[in-house]
């Protein structure tokens, strides 16, 4: 049920982007072209390195679950610290690379200067985007799938609001900035929840002893 709702929200987001670009004033062909450049060229570039973080996150989940079962807070903290540092390090490197080389990549790979502009703008998402895959896996590993669903849903709502309001008034830059805002939201709330959960575990173990 949760997965279906997320898919429905993602579909609403996808359908709303060209519609909001029409309201902004683009022609139908320009709106669809801009949407195609964003989703078919720029975003795949930004998401490509996340294959590494997604693989690492998949391996992280059972390790976190095991440590949670053992109530080993220190081990969980160590895994969280190392995984987040790795993701943020990769994300910062990709931010620098995509920001500096975005226009060149757009021309070289897609023969599109617009794709290059999008890659450069989206580069700011990289540290948060890559770290969030680890954060969501950690929350799953802690047995809190409902929390990860809630955070993902709220993040999607930020993007949908961005499409319906900011894209209609400011064009595609409005949507790109809301994409960044949604990833920052997911990152901050994920960190806050994990910190809260670990504090509760420590308190619980303290009272049990």
Enumerate the predicted regions with their spans:
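Hydrophobic, small-residue-rich membrane helices and short re-entrant helix-turn-helix hairpins
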Residues: 28-31, 61-81
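Membrane-interface junctions at transmembrane-helix termini in multi-pass inner-membrane proteins
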Residues: 124-154
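Helix-loop junctions and terminal segments of transmembrane helices
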Residues: 46-70
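Residue-level recognition of transmembrane alpha-helices
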Residues: 40, 87, 119-122, 126, ...
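Membrane-interface helix-loop junctions in multi-pass transport and translocation proteins
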Residues: 143-146, 156-188, 196, 200
């Amino acid at each position: 049920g949760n997965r279906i709702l997320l898919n429905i929200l993602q579909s609403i987001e996808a359908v709303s982007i060209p519609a909001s670009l029409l309201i902004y004033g683009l022609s139908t062909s320009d709106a669809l072209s801009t949407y195609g450049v964003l989703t078919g060229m720029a975003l795949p570039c930004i998401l490509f390195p996340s294959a590494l973080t997604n693989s690492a996150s998949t391996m992280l989940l059972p390790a976190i679950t095991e440590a949670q079962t053992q109530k080993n807070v220190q081990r969980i903290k160590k895994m969280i610290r190392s995984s987040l540092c790795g993701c943020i390090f990769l994300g910062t490197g990709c931010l620098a690379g995509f920001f500096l080389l975005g226009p060149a990549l757009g021309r070289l790979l897609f023969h599109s200067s617009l794709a290059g502009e999008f890659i450069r703008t989206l580069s700011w998402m990289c540290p948060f985007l890559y770290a969030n895959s680890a954060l969501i896996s950690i929350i799953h590993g802690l047995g809190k799938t409902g929390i990860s669903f809630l955070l993902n849903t709220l993040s999607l709502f930020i993007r949908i609001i961005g499409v319906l309001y900011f894209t209609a008034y400011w064009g595609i830059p409005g949507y790109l900035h809301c994409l960044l805002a949604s990833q920052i939201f997911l990152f901050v709330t994920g960190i806050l929840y994990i910190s809260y959960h670990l504090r509760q575990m420590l308190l619980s173990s303290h009272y049990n002893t």
